[in-house]
Structures are given as structure tokens and as C-alpha cells.
Amino acid sequence: MEIYVVRPGDSVDRIAQEFSVPAESIIWNNQLVFPYPLAVGQALLVGEYDETADPRRIDAGGYAYTYISNWVLRQTIPFLNRLFIFSYGFTLEGALVYPPRDESWMIGLCQENGTMPVLTLTPFGSDGKFNNNLIHQLVTNDVVSDELLDNLVFVMQQKGYGGIDIDFEYILAEDRDAFTAFVEKTVERMHENGFVVSVALAPKTSADQRGLLYEGKDYGALGNAADEVLLMTYEWGFKHGPPMAVAPLNMVRRVVDYAVTEIDPAKINLGVPNYGYDWPLPFVRGETEARTIGNVEAVQIAIQNGADIRFDDVASSPYFEYLDESGTEHVVW
């Protein structure tokens, strides 16, 4: 397969003829919607899929909520080595907070397809946001952490999980060493029971980077303790921030360049976003809120509004602008 960028005057039939492939394959591979209009600048996968190729020749994992569409997960899971099921929380006493829907069907799909199901642990408060006070209580209190680890091992054994992903954000700077010690303790306990441990890391570019997202995580120590790490190389462009690429390649490169100085590259997984944002303009900090959209949805917005999709060479990201029915300007990254 190769990537073809749509030019003015293109149609699915014309592209299919140029590449000597069935039009149906272009429609299927790119999730095109009848009557199959295209946007100038749209990137299309063109060519026949090699059915003999190993779908897991790239080591890949993905996060999924328990309410994900059954059809979507069934289409995706053959390509995943690991499925990170999102998510379990915990209380101040170390009791588990279960996902909103039972995830047994997802674990069953993993087992059918040879994919490892991974329990994602998050410190969400009652408001659904990361709670650093909850983290502090866990990492500084052995009674709480022992209770939580007992509960985790029980559930993981009972449900058939293969590992755990520790996805903690906004860790207090003063809890940095305590968090590392908690991860080391978790790894020891999980290894005793045959489980692997990964840790999600905010995208740092230096050891002394300031900010609540960064100061509580020691790249070197966490990378040494965990079996693998996920660099969260996304969300530069975010719902309440100014319009920009979600994962600008120039910024991603800076994170990776630093990470490999602290962590064994063989342990590093790179986060790749599968979504974008639609910002109304002008952007007003504290007021403007972007709408989260999927990749296919973004293309449909461009088509419906006659927008040409452009490409930012520095960020290596597509974007476009359009006017909605009320005359409001928008930019999509």
C-alpha cells in the first residue's frame, strides 16, 4: 500500500484506474462514505492489502473504554499486541473502583486473538479528573498500597489480565520518589504473579522540566523499574488550549531524543493520537473549547464545507479552516 494525496478533480474511480486497483478497496481502506466525495489534500491508502503479511509486524497497543463499539474493537484487535482497558480507579483506602461497564467481553476478544489485555490504573477522583491527593495517599501509605495491590492481583487473576498500566498524571513534585518506590513495589508484586508492568509518562524534554505534569516523574528511575513505558506524545493541541497539532512531530522528536538518554529504547512505546480537535475562532483563553473529533469525521467536515486540507511541514500534521453555517470561522488540527 501507499499514500496518495487527493488533487483537484480527483475521484475514487479515477484514482482506482491510475493505480489499477478496485475502487471498492479504496472505499473500504479509507472508510469513505457514499457517494464517496473527496477533499483536496486528503490522504488515501491505495493498494491491495497483503493478506500473508503479519498484522503484528509492528508492536502496537491501544487504549479502549469499556463502552467501545464491539464492531470497532473486533476490526482493530487483530493488529494489537496489547489492549489497555480503560480504566480502574481506587479509593483512599485502596479499594478498587471498577470501570463503568464490565470488560469481560473485551478480555475474551483478546484471548481469541492472542492479544494481551492490560488493566489501566488511574487516580480519578469523584469528578472524573486526575486527583493528586489520591496519588499522595497511595504512594505514602504502605497500608493503602498493600491493600490496592492485593485487590489488583485478585482481579487480574480472576479476569485473565496479562499486565497493568500505571497511568498517573499531575503527581506532586514532593511525591516524585514515593511514586517511583510505589512503581518498584508494584513491579515486584506483579512479577511474582506473572504480570508485566508499564508506566505512562508525560512528554518531558529534560530532567529538570518544570510543571505539574513533569516534576513528579523520574524518567530514568521509572524506566529502570517498569517493563515498558508509554511516552504520551500527544495533547500539545488540546480542548482548552490554542489551536495547534495534537502531536507536532518536531515536539515529539524532542521528547524521544531526551527519553532515550534516560530509558532503554527497547522499553519505550510511542503514543500516537487517533483524533483531532475543531476550534471555533477567534481563540479566547479560558473561554474557547475545542470539539474532539475522529480522523474520518475530520475529513467529512472538510468535504461538507468545501475546505482544502493542508499540511504543516514543521508539525508534520494536516489541518484546514472553514466557515460554519452561522459564519463562525473554525480551524481543525
Regions found by a protein language model. Give the residues of each.
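Active-site groove signature of glycoside hydrolases
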Residues: 84-87, 147-178, 228-242
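Glycan-binding loop/region signatures in secreted carbohydrate-active enzymes
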Residues: 123-130, 134, 276-333
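Glycan-recognition patch characteristic of GH18 chitinases/ENGases
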Residues: 48-147, 151
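Second-shell loop/turn segments in exported
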Residues: 12, 92-97, 134-142, 168-176, ...
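Hydrophobic faces of well-ordered beta-strands that scaffold small-molecule active sites
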Residues: 60-62, 81-85, 117-121, 164-166, ...
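Substrate-binding surface in catalytic domains of secreted glycosidases
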Residues: 92-101, 176-304
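Primarily a LysM-type cell-wall glycan-binding module
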Residues: 1-21, 42-44
